[in-house]
UniProtKB/Swiss-Prot annotation:
Disulfide-bond pairs as recorded: none
Top EC group: transferase
Active site: 449 (phosphohistidine intermediate)
The protein's name: Polyphosphate kinase
Modification after translation: An intermediate of this reaction is the autophosphorylated ppk in which a phosphate is covalently linked to a histidine residue through a N-P bond.
Pfam families: PP_kinase, PP_kinase_C, PP_kinase_C_1, PP_kinase_N
Keywords: ATP-binding, Kinase, Magnesium, Metal-binding, Nucleotide-binding, Phosphoprotein, Transferase
InterPro entries registered for this protein in UniProt: PP_kinase, PP_kinase_C_1, PP_kinase_middle, PP_kinase_middle_dom_sf, PPK_C_dom2, PPK_N_dom, PPK_N_dom_sf
SUPFAM superfamilies associated with the record: Phospholipase D/nuclease, PHP14-like, PPK N-terminal domain-like
Function statement: Catalyzes the reversible transfer of the terminal phosphate of ATP to form a long-chain polyphosphate (polyP).
Residues binding ATP: 55, 482, 578, 606
Organism, as annotated: Bacillus anthracis
Length: 702
């Protein structure tokens, strides 16, 4: 229904918004649900526990750390949506994080581990070992572990050491019987569990069974060999998460690469934001000391009933997956893209028609070939590309280096400020420069998050430009795991736009003219605000307003308010938001025409797609940008239209299939809570599985 003027609602009311941090925790809870879901293969459930832990580590290192910094600085202003102060946010985060970690450990200990045991995969403690296994593990400790360990004594001359971020440590309380005075008899030693050693040590076992013991269990059992002459009183396991957000002062920075390299060294030693302690064998005296030394409070301390740092379960997954194929997802192989058919030459096909790529259902290899073939083609004069996150052994990097070595003009923007990929990107920037590429580090005070490649070719005396645009990174590894779109075109206007875009990045150009591209921080928000306004106008005139928007996160208040206006005008809005969503749907007179769903499953939903009905003249945009304030204001992003009618129909069908998912979809209610979509006896639709089946069918039909 559309509101009358006398019925105006205050769209700034905090009751209409979810807090960003709490909404993110709700997303990670959906990841944890995948570990609890018994329809998922057992080892995949193990992997989801690992992903949950890894996500939470980063959340504490960045988001919680930032809130703590605000509190320390005396900043107590409420955030602009849900109206929570930093202190209130920290309190609510602590309650929810404790609850989620308790559920995580309960899932691991009470469900996943027993199920693994039924398959012959069993965790043993030192006390469970047979005589043969004890002999094996003692020899293993003496030869493989002991030489790597550094026992650190704590006393007046050797203060409590600075312990690495995310490191697992053993606090060993020792008793010295030789001391006369009782107060001098208790000593403390710290042993850091080396991250370079295998966390899971597999033991001699009968038959097809795989029994293992954890590295920290082994070290704990032999601490007397590290502190000879003392009696081991207790061994307490603990792990510290530190503030790891980089502070980069770009003003006056002559060499951004050196500034970032310097800051990276500090990341290991930031203030403690979380302390995890193993419940088993915990010593209250050690715990009291850790509180004091690390300056943590009760809400920062997580006493867990199980092994600390469950990110390690990913390495266990990788070890066991090849041996237990029935416990992992059935293999699904990315198919040849339907827009390429049997064509060998991507460039000649792009001259015929635009090419749409849908990963991981369709192979990422044509994107690699696009750069590799350009490097090998003697007619290619220049290659320009933005890189945000790439794989550890990137074929695209290798192709760019070859192109430069062959004398082509190669310009690469390597975003040095890509969080937790800074070190990797510094390495690639140096390597590309050494190969002869012109490397630029981005735009001051902005992260270049756009995904674009331009190839310039001279053939038969004519200059041709080919452009690849994407919603995801140029990363051949994650392209097998993330859902994303790629688009290759030889349209002249797109080529001109790409040239202008790269000139903006590399020079002193102010906002250039674009035919089709919208670029943040210039005008992406304005573009989408205008498109929503148009949809409102069309709905008032024709009654058929309809918007579908798919993204990773939705936090931008101006865009949220604009969608509330669309809902109030009667426009139907369907949002597919995998992660954080600050918008609340279903609120009478505010958002009753908005539906919000989140799909969390085998593949990480990563594509950004924006659909507007436009009174039948449908408009579809793909983008590198989510509807987040940082994407609108603090990043260089690209949004681009799909012009081909068949391509638009294909993307719309994919959106509709995703909205019909009733297996991996959770829907948000007006209170901000998420619930599984009820199947109600209809056909089960897992959109990701169905998209893979469609890709296979397209290949078979060719």
């Amino acid at each position: 229904m559309e509101l009358s003027k006398g019925n105006i609602v205050n769209l700034n009311d905090t009751a209409y918004y979810n807090n960003r941090e709490l909404s993110w925790l709700a997303f990670n809870e959906r990841v944890l649900q995948e570990a609890q879901d018994e329809t998922n293969p057992l080892l995949e459930r193990l992997k989801f526990i690992s992903i949950f832990s890894s996500n939470l580590d980063e959340f504490f290192m960045v988001r919680v750390a930032g809130l703590k910094d605000q509190v320390s600085a005396g900043f107590n202003q409420p955030e602009n949506k849900a109206g929570l102060t930093p202190k209130k946010q920290l309190n609510k985060i602590a309650i929810k994080a404790h609850e989620l970690m308790t559920v995580q450990y309960g899932t691991f200990k009470n469900y996943v581990l027993p199920a693994l045991e039924l398959e012959g995969i069993e965790r043993l403690t030192f006390h469970d070992l047979t005589k043969e296994q004890r002999e094996f593990i003692e020899e293993y400790f003496d030869e493989q572990i002991f030489p790597v360990l550094t026992p650190v004594a704590i006393d007046a001359y050797r203060p409590f050491p600075m312990l690495l971020n995310k490191s697992l440590n053993l606090a060993t309380l020792l008793y010295d019987e030789k001391q006369v005075e009782e107060e001098n008899r208790t000593k403390l030693g710290i042993v850091q569990v080396p991250s370079l050693l295998e966390r899971f040590i597999f033991l001699p076992s009968e038959g097809q069974k795989h029994k293992f013991i954890l590295l920290e269990d082994v070290i704990s059992s032999f601490t007397h060999k590290l502190f000879t002459g003392y009696k081991v009183s207790s061994v307490t396991r603990f792990r510290i998460t530190r503030n790891a957000d980089l502070t980069i002062h770009e003003e006056g920075a002559r060499d951004l690469l050196k500034v970032i390299e310097k800051e990276l060294k500090k990341r290991k030693w930031g203030a403690a934001v979380r302390l995890e302690v193993g419940k088993e064998h915990i010593d209250e005296r050690v715990l009291a000391l850790l509180y004091e030394v690390l300056e943590v409070k009760d809400e920062d301390v997580y006493i867990m009933d199980g092994p600390l740092d469950l990110t390690c379960l990913f390495s266990l997954y990788k070890k066991l997956a090849p041996l237990y194929e029935h416990l992992v997802y059935p293999a699904l192989i990315p198919q040849r893209p339907q827009d390429l058919g049997d064509a060998e030459d991507v460039f000649e096909k792009a001259i015929e028609h635009d090419i749409l790529l849908h990963h991981p259902f369709e192979s990422f290899q044509p994107v690699v070939d696009f750069v590799r073939d350009a490097a090998d083609d003697p007619n290619v004069l220049a290659i320009k590309q933005t890189l945000y996150r790439v794989s550890g052994d990137s074929p695209i990097i290798q192709a760019l280096k070859i192109a430069a070595e062959k004398g082509k003009q190669v310009t690469v923007l390597v975003e040095l400020k890509a969080r937790f990929d800074e070190e990797n990107n510094v390495h690639w920037a140096k390597e590309l420069e050494q190969a002869g590429c012109h490397v630029i580090y981005g735009v001051s005070h902005l992260k270049t998050h756009s995904k674009i490649t331009l190839v310039v070719r001279r053939k038969n005396g004519k200059i041709e430009r080919f452009v690849h645009l994407g919603t995801g990174n140029y990363n051949d590894a994650t392209a097998k795991l993330y859902t994303d779109f790629g688009y290759i075109t030889s349209r002249k206007d797109f080529g001109v736009d790409a040239t202008n875009f790269f000139n903006y990045l590399s020079g002193y150009t102010t906002k250039p003219h674009f035919h089709h591209l919208s670029v943040a921080p210039f005008d992406i928000r304005e573009q989408f605000m205008d498109l929503i306004d148009e949809e409102i106008r069309y709905h008032r005139q024709y009654g058929n307003g309809y918007i579908i928007a798919k993204m990773n996160s939705l936090t931008d208040k101006p865009l949220i308010k604009k969608m509330y206006e669309a809902s109030q005008a009667g426009v139907k809005v369907e949002l597919i938001v995998r992660g954080t969503c600050c918008l609340r749907p279903g609120i009478p007179n505010v958002s009753e025409n908005i539906r919000v769903v989140s799909v969390v499953g085998r593949y990480l939903e990563h594509s950004r797609i924006y659909y507007f009905h436009h009174n039948g003249e449908e408009k579809i945009y793909l983008s590198s940008a989510d509807w987040m304030t940082r994407n609108m204001e603090k990043r260089v992003e690209i949004s681009f239209p799909i012009l081909d009618i068949e391509m638009k129909a294909r993307i719309k069908a994919i959106l509709q299939l995703t909205l019909a998912d009733n297996v991996k979809t959770r829907e948000q209610n007006k209170d901000g809570d998420y619930y599984y979509v009820i199947n109600s006896g209809a056909e089960e639709i897992d959109s990701q599985v169905k998209l893979f089946k469609m890709a296979y069918q397209n290949t078979d039909a060719e």
